[in-house]
Each structure stands twice: as structure tokens, then as C-alpha cells.
Regions:
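Active-site beta-loop-alpha junctions of metal-dependent nucleic acid enzymes
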Residues: 39-41, 46-49, 64-89
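Basic, flexible linker segments flanking DNA-binding modules
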Residues: 1-32, 101, 109-111, 126-129, ...
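An active-site-proximal beta-strand-loop segment
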Residues: 16-61, 73
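Short small-residue beta-strand/loop micro-motif enriched in glycine and branched aliphatics
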Residues: 60-64, 120-122, 146
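Mobile genetic element proteins and their domesticated derivatives, centered on retroelements
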Residues: 17, 53, 59, 77-78, ...
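RNase H-like polynucleotidyl transferase catalytic core
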Residues: 91-99, 113-132, 148-151
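C-terminal domain-tail junction helix/linker
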Residues: 1-6, 11-12, 113-117, 138-191
Length: 191
């Protein structure tokens, strides 16, 4: 049984997750070149790790495209994400993550403790517990990463800031009665 919930105020709970995404080789992948040619063009391009933080109440999202998912990278990402939410007028109380190694590390624990934030983890093998960020991952893949055939990873990354701005400020959400996340955030001055 899946129980749906929504916290009462922005910052009551922030869902955090990492999405691993294959890089696009220069010249394009299979969407540009076709399946057979795309296979020949893919070797050694590696992965991008999309570190995501989504507010439970407003669905306001913060994402960075980083090179890895280590115990050093995740806390550094959270420091910047926390500043993003604070600048938007959101006081973060709790963070929900899966049980990835970077979220079980001492640096992650310490960065949350320094800010007075409670850390909650999902039960193992229950990604639906962190469903709001998992749904955000799916939306991000459908509407940005795989929305059109990019000819390089640089082209795809260059398109990301505009997509994220649209997601936060203009894209309506069914769960928010068709309103964008920005409509539920008390202070978006300077954006």
C-alpha cells in the first residue's frame, strides 16, 4: 500500500537523490546517429551524476551535474543546495535520502548536523519512499535529457539551466493543481 503525503510547509522535508546518466559522445549518440552507429560512437564517454534536491511541499528543485557520487561530493552539493533553499526563504528541517554510501558517510552526517538538519533514510530497496525526487528524476529525463537528440554532452548540459528554471517557475504540476513550484515558495526575490 502506497500512502501519499505532503508536508505542510516548504523545508519540512527535502528529498535528495543522485541520478546516474550516460554522457553523450561528440557527434551524438544513437538518437542522432541511429542505433548501430551510436553503439560505435559511445566508448569511453563516462557518466554524469545529477545530484537532486526537491522540496516535499513545493516541489522546488535544485540540481547540479557533477562528476561522481563520492562522500566528498555529496556534502559539498548539499551545502550549495541548502544555500539555494535558504536564499528562497525556505528553512530546511529534514532531509530524506536513500542508503547510498555517500549518504551514510561521516561528512554527510556532519554537514547536516552543523546546519541542525535531521537526516532520514528510506528503507532499503524502497525507492518509492523517496518518490518526489524519483518522479523529478523521471520528469528531468523525459523533458530535458532525452527530450531531443543532442549532438554532444556540452549541448545537453547547456540546455539544462533553462529547463530547470522553467520547471521551477513555469511548469505546472498535477500535485500542485496545475501551479508551478515557485507558487508555493514564500520568497523568490532575486530570481
Amino acid at each position: 500500500v502506497i500512502r501519499r503525503y505532503e508536508h505542510a510547509a516548504p523545508g519540512d522535508l527535502i528529498h535528495v537523490d543522485i541520478k546516474k546518466l550516460g554522457n553523450i559522445p561528440d557527434g551524438g549518440g544513437h538518437q542522432v546517429l541511429g542505433r548501430a552507429a551510436g553503439r560505435k560512437n559511445r566508448s569511453g564517454v563516462g557518466y554524469a551524476y545529477l545530484h537532486n534536491a526537491v522540496d516535499d511541499h513545493s516541489r522546488l528543485a535544485y540540481t547540479e551535474i557533477l562528476a561522481d557520487e563520492t562522500k566528498e561530493t555529496a556534502p559539498a552539493f548539499w551545502t550549495r543546495a541548502h544555500k539555494f533553499f535558504t536564499d528562497a526563504g525556505i528553512t530546511v528541517h529534514r532531509v530524506l535520502t536513500d542508503n547510498g554510501a555517500c549518504y551514510r558517510s561521516h561528512p554527510w552526517r556532519d554537514v547536516l548536523a552543523e546546519a541542525g538538519i535531521t537526516h532520514k533514510r528510506t528503507r532499503p530497496y524502497r525507492p518509492q519512499t523517496n518518490g518526489k525526487v524519483e518522479r523529478y528524476n523521471r520528469t528531468m529525463l523525459e523533458e530535458w535529457a532525452y527530450a531531443r537528440p543532442y549532438t554532444s554532452e556540452q549541448e545537453r548540459r547547456a540546455a539544462f539551466p533553462a529547463w530547470l528554471y522553467t520547471y521551477n517557475h513555469h511548469r505546472g504540476h498535477t500535485a500542485l493543481n496545475g501551479s508551478p513550484p515557485a507558487s508555493r515558495v514564500p520568497n523568490l526575490m532575486g530570481w
